[in-house]
């Protein structure tokens, strides 16, 4: 689908090619204030990232851009110079709110209205997260709640958050298995299909893979806490190998059990004992008297005495 945005000060609109959920199709046909692009703080990097609010925040998508040099799009009878492909992936907005809950707990450590917790001067659009229905329904999974009159107050709960994240990991594992996604140490590329998928992949491999996917939306401390909570061993420290068994060394001299010298023989005796060929036998019978060795013809002549 093609997304459009009006350029300020001109009647021309800016376009992108966007892969997005079907729920965005109606808003794409007609310009609507219900669909908004907003820059929010990414929990993993603590930097700004682009998100898409669909239907007034009923669904939130993370927007990633696939970009290659010298790429354009042909749209109708025009050429779209911006050749990027934007991909909008649905995300649970609680991952974005969780960052502010943890921060407020470290700084104040007390119950507060959620409107005072989700505040960011650098990314003021974060207040839009509170309008999302999934956030209001899921706050109790990661916080302790207090209600005074008609007002609710919240405080981050690490224990409840780990339980909630573990369920997320378990659901992700089910999707990985049902989708036949290759996991484990033997996988070098997600595009490779491994025939022995079921034989050498352990449950721990699925859990570790799912933990890695979920961790892309968590702070570093929470990633480590979740890994310990799931019982995943630390791969940075290698598993100690069992000690090598030492062989007993005897002080008694080593003696040969067999006399190997009997196999030794003089090479000359071997030659004499070897059988002679028919040509050699005939040559031996020839009378060699008066014959000279061939080397005698090449030796220097002796000087005659005067």
From Swiss-Prot:
<dbReference type="Pfam" id="PF09468">
    <property type="entry name" value="RNase_H2-Ydr279"/>
</dbReference>
<dbReference type="GO" id="GO:0032299">
    <property type="term" value="C:ribonuclease H2 complex"/>
</dbReference>
<dbReference type="InterPro" id="IPR019024">
    <property type="entry name" value="RNase_H2_suB_wHTH"/>
</dbReference>
<dbReference type="Pfam" id="PF17745">
    <property type="entry name" value="Ydr279_N"/>
</dbReference>
<dbReference type="GO" id="GO:0005634">
    <property type="term" value="C:nucleus"/>
</dbReference>
<protein>
    <recommendedName>
        <fullName>Ribonuclease H2 subunit B</fullName>
    </recommendedName>
</protein>
<keyword id="KW-0539">Nucleus</keyword>
<feature type="compositionally biased region" description="Basic and acidic residues">
    <location>
        <begin position="259"/>
        <end position="269"/>
    </location>
</feature>
<dbReference type="GO" id="GO:0006401">
    <property type="term" value="P:RNA catabolic process"/>
</dbReference>
<dbReference type="InterPro" id="IPR040456">
    <property type="entry name" value="RNase_H2_suB"/>
</dbReference>
<feature type="region of interest" description="Disordered">
    <location>
        <begin position="232"/>
        <end position="285"/>
    </location>
</feature>
<comment type="subunit">
    <text>The RNase H2 complex is a heterotrimer composed of the catalytic subunit rnaseh2a and the non-catalytic subunits rnaseh2b and rnaseh2c.</text>
</comment>
<comment type="similarity">
    <text>Belongs to the RNase H2 subunit B family.</text>
</comment>
<dbReference type="InterPro" id="IPR041195">
    <property type="entry name" value="Rnh202_N"/>
</dbReference>
<comment type="function">
    <text>Non catalytic subunit of RNase H2, an endonuclease that specifically degrades the RNA of RNA:DNA hybrids. Participates in DNA replication, possibly by mediating the removal of lagging-strand Okazaki fragment RNA primers during DNA replication. Mediates the excision of single ribonucleotides from DNA:RNA duplexes.</text>
</comment>
């Amino acid at each position: 689908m093609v997304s459009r945005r009006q350029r300020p000060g001109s009647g021309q609109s800016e376009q992108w090619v966007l892969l997005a959920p079907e729920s965005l199709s109606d808003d794409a046909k007609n310009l609507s204030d219900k669909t908004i692009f907003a820059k929010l703080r990414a929990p993993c990097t603590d930097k700004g990232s682009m998100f898409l609010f669909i239907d007034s925040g009923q669904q939130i998508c993370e927007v990633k851009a696939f970009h290659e040099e010298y790429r354009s799009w042909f749209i109708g009878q025009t050429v779209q110079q911006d050749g990027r492909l934007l991909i909008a992936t649905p995300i649970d907005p609680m991952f974005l709110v969780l960052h502010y809950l943890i921060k407020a707990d470290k700084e104040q450590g007390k119950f507060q209205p959620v409107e005072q917790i989700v505040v960011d001067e650098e990314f003021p659009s974060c207040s839009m997260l509170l309008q999302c229905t999934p956030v209001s329904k899921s706050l109790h999974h990661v916080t302790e709640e207090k209600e005074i009159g008609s007002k609710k107050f919240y405080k981050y709960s690490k224990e409840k958050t780990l339980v909630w994240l573990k369920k997320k990991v378990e659901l992700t594992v089910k999707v990985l298995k049902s989708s036949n996604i290759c996991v484990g140490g033997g996988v070098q590329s997600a595009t490779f299909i491994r025939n022995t998928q079921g034989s050498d992949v352990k449950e721990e491999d699925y859990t570790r893979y799912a933990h890695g996917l979920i961790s892309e939306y968590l702070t570093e401390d929470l990633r480590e806490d979740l890994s310990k909570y799931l019982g995943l061993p630390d791969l940075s420290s290698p598993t100690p190998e069992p000690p090598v068994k030492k062989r007993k060394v005897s002080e008694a001299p080593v003696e040969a059990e067999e006399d190997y010298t009997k196999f030794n023989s003089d090479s000359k005796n071997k030659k004499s004992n070897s059988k002679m060929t028919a040509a050699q036998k005939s040559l031996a019978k020839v009378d060699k008297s008066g014959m000279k060795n061939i080397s005698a013809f090449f030796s220097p002549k002796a000087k005659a005495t005067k």
